[in-house]
Amino acid sequence: MLTVKEKGILLYIIEHCQRIEEKIVGATRKTLDENKDVLEIICFNILQIGELAKKLETDFIKKHNKMPWSDIKGMRDIVAHGYGTINLDKVWKTASEEVKSLREYCESIIEENK
């Protein structure tokens, strides 16, 4: 059973994933070079996802270990402390390939714990 805190965190992670997914519809990797607003929105939501992941307890992470939670937290640190040196290829890969699986995994955890 999920705690209220865990469910809340997962719901917020899902929300931030959806924001990224909505923002990249019709976008390409090149969009990140050409549209700083899109880049900033994606990075902000990646940062928020990482912050939320850091609030998950060790027991939760051990139980729900099909997602690389430490990498998610690490990506937050890269975005937060990149100081203009963020690898845009990595940001694009995260946004276009990894965010959907994170959202689906979080949704499945909530569904399994109804």
Where are these regions (language model features)?
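Solvent-exposed interaction patches of small proteins and small membrane subunits
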Residues: 1-114
